[in-house]
A protein has these predicted regions:
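Periplasmic solute-binding protein
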Residues: 1, 21-27, 98-107
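Bilobed "Venus flytrap"/periplasmic-binding protein-like clamshell domains
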Residues: 3-72
């Protein structure tokens, strides 16, 4: 399957005005499809609404869903299949990783509490490593704290979630490329202009 197969189809998605919309429209354009003319995109406020609509539409449904909703939906309906992985498709047209979640700290706090920020990042990296290395333990924790209804869903979804730790120049390159996509789609999405170098955290930034 390819993006060409989406031409003339209706796509169900969450996130109008947020990451899902901008990434989907970017990838459609990169693959020669006009998102305003060649496809119809229907937006819903929650992923659960998308899966409900898919169930109602049955075999004709095409949807953009994040993990773990993809896995949860497939566990309920074995006929559902992933035909395009947006992370892989992003990697085909962009030299940097697709970013869907970041950690943000206020500059004033980072300058006043540099050790706390650094220690948090160390713990965060350990958490990322644990999420990838201890699937069973992480899945159980996901159920315990209510991230997913059942650990079995998390266990299947976690290896597909692309949970990574990025910092420094690597992080800056990935985030900057993503913000450029947002800016090109709608400057207002990033406050009207792209951020300067001070926007990105480095230990050197804190040490000033």
């Amino acid at each position: 399957h390819s993006f060409a197969d989406l031409k003339g189809r209706t796509i169900l998605s969450t996130g109008k005005g947020t990451t899902p919309e901008y990434v989907l429209r970017y990838l459609l354009r990169k693959n020669g499809i006009d998102p305003d003319k060649d496809v119809k995109i229907e937006y819903y406020s929650e992923a659960s609404e998308v899966t409900a609509q898919m169930a109602a539409t049955k075999k004709d449904a095409i949807a953009v869903l994040p993990q773990p909703y993809v896995t949860a939906a497939q566990m309920k309906d074995s006929s559902l299949r992933v035909v395009l992985d947006l992370t892989r498709e992003w990697n085909k047209v962009c030299d940097t990783q697709l970013i869907t979640g970041v950690t943000v700290v206020r500059t004033a706090y980072a300058e006043e509490h540099p050790e706390e920020v650094i220690n948090f990042l160390k713990d965060y990296q350990k958490s990322v490593d644990a999420a990838n290395d201890d699937i069973d333990g992480t899945a159980a924790l996901c159920e315990e704290v209510g991230v997913v209804a059942k650990a079995a869903i998390a266990k299947k979804a976690l290896p597909k979630c692309n949970i990574v730790y990025r910092i420094g120049d690597e992080m800056k390159a990935d985030v900057n490329a993503y913000l450029q996509v947002l800016y090109d789609a709608s400057p207002a999405a990033v406050g009207g202009k792209l951020p300067d170098a001070n926007f990105y955290y480095t230990e050197a930034t804190v040490a000033k």
